[in-house]
């Protein structure tokens, strides 16, 4: 904050900037929406990439802070957790929408809610639901192109719930999943039902004709190929009748009926390894599956972009405690990151300190 004050106002404006972030009432949603629309032309986005963001904290008064497991770093720590939506395309990427993930303890802690100015309607919810809400706002409410949604769900047990919810909203997705997670339940006519993992589906398809293969670009470490197969959900035409149904998901409201959607399972198989490097679940149809390597590359690139943002755009440098302050801070981070795409003159800056 002091560095911005010195550079922009010649010093002495730090307190005003703090107030602008923590106490002002400007609407962050409007700024994000307008920023996203301005970025569509320069970025030519091909996908919306959803990532987890982690804000390590020392105390326990900042909004949403708790000792909790951060999937993206693989450990427990005292932190705030959020999710961010990137517009991503060949020309670059930029974060355009954000959600703060509230831990369950914050629902009933009226003292901390009051001190953090947390709105009454903000509560803990499953991650998959938060993803659906922020994506729905970004695409439907802001009227952005309905491009595929790419999310890493390896460490989340609600893959099926997220997939079904996105299908209800008519949104295509590319979800990274754990190969050992349940994918479908096979129900032979004269045997007990058996649940197959995503790895089982891929393994079974390598011995059939229902498989699509691409050789991966040379820039992918290990080379190899990407293989994809349709996730069965109807009787197979084989020697015995079997019915494949999606693995069980959490209950959804009775008003939400999932439309019939073809799903594909894909695995990235390097030539130097015996097993798959990554496994994916997608609603891309057969004619669009050739674009899957591009979405995987975009997802990998965003991970590197996010790490750079922590330093270059000052993402982790929020010192306030309020709900609105957090949203103002991350919105300004989006604006700072977008400057390289919106300004015709490229400006190189050092890390924010």
Question: Residue locations for each model-derived region?
Answer:
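Short amphipathic alpha-helical "interface-anchor" segments enriched in bulky aromatics
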Residues: 54, 288-320
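An anionic, glycine-rich sequence signature occurring as long contiguous blocks
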Residues: 93-94, 104-106, 120, 174-178, ...
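Basic, amphipathic alpha-helical segments enriched in Lys/Arg and hydrophobic/aromatic residues
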Residues: 315-353
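Electropositive, glycine- and tryptophan-enriched low-complexity nucleic-acid-binding patches
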Residues: 15-19, 73-145, 274-278
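Domain-level cores of phosphate- or acyl-group-handling catalytic modules
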Residues: 115-188
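Active-site-proximal, Lys/Arg-enriched surface segment
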Residues: 25-104
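Short, conserved catalytic/metal-binding motifs centered on acidic residues
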Residues: 4, 47-56, 85, 148-156, ...
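Gly/serine-rich nucleotide phosphate-binding loop at the start of the catalytic core
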Residues: 1-19
């Amino acid at each position: 904050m002091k560095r911005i004050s010195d550079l922009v106002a010649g010093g002495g404006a730090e307190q005003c900037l703090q107030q602008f972030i923590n106490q002002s009432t400007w609407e962050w949603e409007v700024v994000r929406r307008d920023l996203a629309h301005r970025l569509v032309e320069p970025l030519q986005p091909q996908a919306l990439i959803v990532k987890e963001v982690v804000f390590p904290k020392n105390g326990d008064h900042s909004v949403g802070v708790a000792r909790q497991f951060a999937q993206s770093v693989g450990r427990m720590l005292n932190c705030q957790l959020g999710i961010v939506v990137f517009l991503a395309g060949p020309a670059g990427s930029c974060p355009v929408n954000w959600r703060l993930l509230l831990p369950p303890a914050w629902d009933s802690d009226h003292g901390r809610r009051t001190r953090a100015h947390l709105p009454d309607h903000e509560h803990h919810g499953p991650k998959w639901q938060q993803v659906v809400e922020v994506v729905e706002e970004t695409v439907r409410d802001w009227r952005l192109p309905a491009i595929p949604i790419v999310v890493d769900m390896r460490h989340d047990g609600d893959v099926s719930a997220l997939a079904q919810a996105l299908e209800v909203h008519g949104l295509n997705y590319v979800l990274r999943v754990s190969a050992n997670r349940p994918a479908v339940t096979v129900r032979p006519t004269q045997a007990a039902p058996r649940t197959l993992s995503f790895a089982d589906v891929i393994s079974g398809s390598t011995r059939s004709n229902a498989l699509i293969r691409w050789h991966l670009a040379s820039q992918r470490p290990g080379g190899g190929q990407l293989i994809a197969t349709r996730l069965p959900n109807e009787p197979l035409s084989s020697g015995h009748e079997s019915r494949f149904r999606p693995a069980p998901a959490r209950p959804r409201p009775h008003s939400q009926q999932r439309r019939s959607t073809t799903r594909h399972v894909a695995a990235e198989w390097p030539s130097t390894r015996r097993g798959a490097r990554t496994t994916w679940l997608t609603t891309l149809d057969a004619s669009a599956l050739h674009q899957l390597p591009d979405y995987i590359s975009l997802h990998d690139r965003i991970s590197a972009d996010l790490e750079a943002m922590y330093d270059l755009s000052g993402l982790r440098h929020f010192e306030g405690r309020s709900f609105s302050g957090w949203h103002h801070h991350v919105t300004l981070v989006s604006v700072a990151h977008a400057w390289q795409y919106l300004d015709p003159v490229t400006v190189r800056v050092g890390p924010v300190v």
